[in-house]
């Protein structure tokens, strides 16, 4: 019952944010003019953009397949693609993408994959996923100051905030993995402080859950110490995966027949948006992503093509991802665990 209420809340929240985003983007705009501009788009340039989205989803499935193999669990690649699709679908519709991994663990459990194993794999996926954003963010802050001044000066503060939040997130996860005793001490003291301030009720079961979590982090630490090259390989795949999705915006740029801005700048600007919004509590960064796009891509697309460009870029980067992952999540519902049920 509680899960149903949570799902209803997430769907309603997604709908409200979507409506607010539509209003914010199109209020005061000439919709007929935008529609006419969209009709002039070269569709052949959009097909590679869709391929970029598929590569993005496929990339995580390769990571899951690869890591499961190192743990002695042999899965078919198409099942890993379904696990990946489930994760992206629920991440797209929940605030801060919180619903993705619990859903993946649920579907993996249906395939008789032990929860500690699926938790380990998905934790490493999360760490490397965030690490790519940290590398982009810190790389620009240290080596790309000229780029920041030239292309994204007006949004630099939210970019710094997004980078800082991602650094904090990755640092926290690495602390939990490699220093679980210290992390446990910090968390216990933090909970005691919140209880004293009456911001949290005392629950004895909370410590038990914390201890169980620490065991999982310890397992991850042991695995990483013995498989450092696996982490390096996963990071490389994740880097390729993320930049494949960022590249979709360049194909949108070419679909309008534009030239003058090189692919590197467009792809990097799209990555800046991802770094900035990734940790914000909005499904798919909806609303704020559109705002940032309009601020940093106007010199690239021009004022006339800015909103049509935004529609296609977000259409590929978020809504196409949502649609594709939704379709394969439905497939997962009918196929994951099916053979096991037949044998039973």
Regions found by a protein language model. Name each.
Residues 1-32, 36, 90-200, 282, ...:
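Transmembrane helix-loop-helix hairpins in multi-pass inner-membrane proteins
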Residues 79-87, 264-275, 304-315:
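Alpha-helical transmembrane segments of multi-pass membrane proteins
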